[in-house]
Amino acid sequence: KLKAKGFTSIGSENNLALFMGDFTGRNATIGVTATDDGKSVFAVAVLFDPSGEWNTLVNTYNYYKDLYTRKYGNPTISKEKNPAHLDSNTALMAEVHQGTVVWGSAWEVTGGNIELSIEKTSGFYEGMVMIRYRDSQNVETKIQKDLEDI
C-alpha cells in the first residue's frame, strides 16, 4: 500500500520494513512491523526529519495533535513538559538531548492506539516528531506467540 502511495522502500530486516516518502506534505520515514508470518501489520511508526529547533518540533507536534484531535477527539492522555529553566532554543534542545523532555499525546481508537511524541535523536541537540500506530489485535497475537517461545 505504501509503494502505491509513492513511498520508496529503503530496506527491511526481520519483520521491519522501512519506507521514505511524503506523509501529509512532509518528508518522513515510515517503519512497518509485521507479525512473524508477515501476514499482518501490528505497528507503524512515522518519523519526521530531525530538527535542532524547538519551535519547529513543537509546531509540527501541535499540527498533528490538532489533526488527530479533530479526527478522534481529545487525547486519552497528554503530557507536555520540558524542564528547561530558560526559554532559549539551546536550553530547550539541551533537555531534548538529555532525554528529560516528556512531550506526547495518545489516542485510544477502534482496534488500537496512536501515540504522538517529540523524541531525542542521535544527532547533537536534535529531536524529531514521531507518530506510532498500534493494532491491538495483532499486538496481542504477537504477544501470545512470544509467550509460547519463552
List the model feature ranges, each with a label.
Residues 21-64:
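Mid-chain, structured segments of secreted extracytoplasmic proteins
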Residues 1-14, 49-150:
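Non-cytosolic coordination micro-motifs
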Residues 1-33:
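Short N-terminal edge-element motif at the start of the domain
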